[in-house]
Amino acid sequence: AVVYSPALRLRNPLSMLLPLLKHVAPFWAKPKDTLTDPEAVRHLWSYPTFPTRAGHELLKLQRQVRRDLPRVTCPLLIVHSTRDDQVHPGSPHRVHDRVGSRDKELLLLHNSGHALTVDKEWEVVAERTYAFIQTRLGPRHQGSDGHAAGT
């Protein structure tokens, strides 16, 4: 499995108020994208706000995931950027330390924002993701050229 920018905890401390906010403010303005590549924004689309009810559901999901991390035993690649302004900086380390997988890697990037699959280091993300999956598939899933069969 591969996880990008794992949001076990959000960086914004006000996110903890979402269980209350959902009753008085149905929407919360999203922060401005902080991508390091100005061209990357062309690859993203989203609403300018998000429903606070959905944010509250995310908080509940985060609690459940934190409880279940030790049960995850598949190979795991965790990719996170130190410049991510959405996810708490301790989240990827907590996933790495608490997950039950023995085969796990933490890749920290230093020149991308939250949307690291389209930002400046997207090629590193793609290459490391591909390599991680390929090495775990084994030779029977590879064609004669060393790539995944059928690609």
Where are these regions (language model features)?
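Catalytic active-site module of serine/aspartate enzymes centered on a nucleophile-bearing elbow/loop
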Residues: N111-T151
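Short beta-strand/loop motif that positions the catalytic acidic residue
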Residues: V72, I78-H80, D84
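A catalytic-pocket lid/entrance helix-loop region that shapes and gates access to the active site
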Residues: M16-K32
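Short glycine/proline- and acidic residue-enriched helix-loop micro-motifs
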Residues: L35-T49
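Catalytic histidine neighborhood in serine/cysteine hydrolases
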Residues: H93, D97-A115
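Short alpha-helix in the alpha/beta-hydrolase fold that links the catalytic acid
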Residues: C74, H88-D97
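Active-site nucleophile loop of the alpha/beta-hydrolase fold
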Residues: V2-P13
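Active-site nucleophile elbow and catalytic-triad environment of alpha/beta-hydrolase enzymes
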Residues: P51-D68, C74
